[in-house]
């Protein structure tokens, strides 16, 4: 995992900065990364597959850098429809940022697809299982799990 971060230090540093939601976003990304690495071991992924999964997991929310900070401090039930749509665009923003950073296509797919659901109910495209890469499906599952286990304390945000 450390080697993957060293390959793309600028991307990892972006995730740690205040411009990307600060400590809470970084902690969430780290949780998702660690859980994904545990799954990679259990699924007996190759070292290359695990590296891709780990880096994609760490950077899955990098697009939040381009979402206004005030939206990151609102509870989801407080969003207006346009605000919800704007936050949902973080997948697209992440894809753009990842391309600017020169990230490989398999990591870009994780960043772009990490809110897709196998039944087609996710976003940004509403893709179904066969159109979502396996690493993106793993990150989506772990992302959802971490959000359930560690809800954001919006009073502190």
Regions found by a protein language model. Give the residues of each.
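Acidic/His-rich, divalent-metal-binding segments that scaffold phosphate/diphosphate chemistry
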Residues: 1-88, 95-102, 106
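A ubiquitous short alpha-helical element
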Residues: 19-24, 78-80, 126-133, 151-152
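Charged catalytic carboxylate motif
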Residues: 31, 93, 137-140
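Histidine/acidic-rich helix-loop-helix segments that form or flank divalent-metal centers
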Residues: 57, 85, 98-100, 104-140, ...
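Structural signal for well-ordered, non-membrane alpha-helices
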Residues: 94-95, 119, 146
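Active-site-proximal, acidic helix/loop segment immediately C-terminal to a metal-coordinating Asp/Glu
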Residues: 146-157
């Amino acid at each position: 995992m450390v080697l993957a971060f060293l390959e793309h230090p600028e991307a990892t540093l972006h995730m740690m900065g205040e411009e990307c939601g600060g400590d809470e976003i970084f902690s969430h990304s780290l949780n998702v990364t660690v859980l994904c690495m545990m799954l990679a071991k259990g699924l007996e992924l190759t070292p290359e597959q695990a590296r891709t999964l780990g880096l994609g997991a760490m950077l899955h929310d990098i697009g939040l850098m381009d979402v206004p900070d005030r939206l990151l401090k609102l509870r989801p039930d407080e969003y207006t429809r346009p605000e919800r749509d704007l936050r949902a665009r973080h997948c697209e923003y992440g894809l753009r940022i990842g391309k600017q950073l020169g990230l490989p296509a398999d990591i870009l797919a994780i960043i772009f697809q990490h809110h897709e659901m196998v039944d087609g109910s996710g976003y940004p495209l509403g893709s179904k299982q066969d159109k979502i890469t396996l690493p993106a499906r793993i990150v989506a599952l772990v992302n959802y799990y971490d959000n359930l286990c560690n809800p954001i304390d919006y009073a502190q945000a």
